[in-house]
Amino acid sequence: MSESKSGPEYASFFAVMGASAAMVFSALGAAYGTAKSGTGIAAMSVMRPEQIMKSIIPVVMAGIIAIYGLVVAVLIANSLNDDISLYKSFLQLGAGLSVGLSGLAAGFAIGIVGDAGVRGTAQQPRLFVGMILILIFAEVLGLYGLIVALILSTK
């Protein structure tokens, strides 16, 4: 096995896995959040069809999680080259896992809170502000992963 001047031939594999992890895990979280809160919207809209547009917020917030993963995956993919060092590729893997797994967790939280919040808001409209605050805290979990990933990938 030959080594280039910067690292072994297989070094780029870890960077590619970081880009893949960023996109796959954040998209899984976004898909779960969208599906879970979407079923709550569908159930709520039977009783209160006038609240459909107001209740779409959890679905939008879940979709933003996938954008975080896309941003990091594109940054990692753009930094790939033939002579990437093993150190740099492990940083890229860490960045991808950071944003991906935090996006997965945030997507799950947004889906569960969005589903329960939308159904509860249909019964008691005063719950809307509380639901939005909890959704913001869930979204911030994904944002923390994005910040760490940006720091790691630009090192």
From Swiss-Prot:
The entry's keywords: Cytoplasmic vesicle, Disease variant, Epilepsy, Host-virus interaction, Hydrogen ion transport, Ion transport, Membrane, Synapse, Transmembrane, Transmembrane helix, Transport, Ubl conjugation
UniProt topological domain (Cytoplasmic) ranges: 34-55, 115-131
Site annotation Essential for proton translocation: residues: 139
Gene3D superfamilies the record matches: lithium bound rotor ring of v- atpase
Topology relative to the membrane: Multi-pass membrane protein
GO cellular component term of the entry, any: azurophil granule membrane
Listed transmembrane segments: 11-33, 56-76, 93-114, 132-152
GO biological process terms on file: endosomal lumen acidification; Golgi lumen acidification; intracellular pH reduction; lysosomal lumen acidification; positive regulation of Wnt signaling pathway; proton transmembrane transport; regulation of macroautophagy; synaptic vesicle lumen acidification
Effect of residue 138 to P: In EPEO3; likely pathogenic; decreased function in proton transmembrane transport
Consequence when changing residue 150 to P: In EPEO3; likely pathogenic; severely decreased function in proton transmembrane transport
Effect of residue 48 to P: In EPEO3; likely pathogenic; decreased function in proton transmembrane transport
Record note on what altering residue 149 to T does: In EPEO3; likely pathogenic; severely decreased function in proton transmembrane transport
Post-translation changes: Ubiquitinated by RNF182, leading to its degradation via the ubiquitin-proteasome pathway.
Database matches in SUPFAM superfamilies: F1F0 ATP synthase subunit C
GO molecular function, one term: proton-transporting ATP synthase activity, rotational mechanism
Reported impact of residue 139 to A: Severely decreased proton transmembrane transport
Lumenal side: 1-10, 77-92, 153-155
Compartments reported by the entry: Cytoplasmic vesicle, Clathrin-coated vesicle membrane; Cytoplasmic vesicle, Secretory vesicle, Synaptic vesicle membrane
UniProt effect for mutating residue 95 to T: In EPEO3; likely pathogenic; decreased function in proton transmembrane transport
Family per record: Belongs to the V-ATPase proteolipid subunit family.
Disease: Epilepsy, early-onset, 3, with or without developmental delay: An autosomal dominant neurologic disorder characterized by various types of seizures with onset in the first months or years of life. Many patients present with febrile seizures and later develop afebrile seizures. Some affected individuals have global developmental delay or regression, impaired intellectual development, poor or absent speech, and motor delay. Additional variable features include hypotonia, gait ataxia, behavioral abnormalities, and anomalies on brain imaging.
Function: Proton-conducting pore forming subunit of the V0 complex of vacuolar(H+)-ATPase (V-ATPase), a multisubunit enzyme composed of a peripheral complex (V1) that hydrolyzes ATP and a membrane integral complex (V0) that translocates protons. V-ATPase is responsible for acidifying and maintaining the pH of intracellular compartments, and in some cell types, it is targeted to the plasma membrane, where it is responsible for acidifying the extracellular environment.
Assembly, per entry: V-ATPase is a heteromultimeric enzyme made up of two complexes: the ATP-hydrolytic V1 complex and the proton translocation V0 complex. The V1 complex consists of three catalytic AB heterodimers that form a heterohexamer, three peripheral stalks each consisting of EG heterodimers, one central rotor including subunits D and F, and the regulatory subunits C and H. The proton translocation complex V0 consists of the proton transport subunit a, a ring of proteolipid subunits c9c'', rotary subunit d, subunits e and f, and the accessory subunits ATP6AP1/Ac45 and ATP6AP2/PRR.
Protein name as it appears in the record: V-type proton ATPase 16 kDa proteolipid subunit c
Source species: Homo sapiens
Gene name linked to the record: ATP6V0C
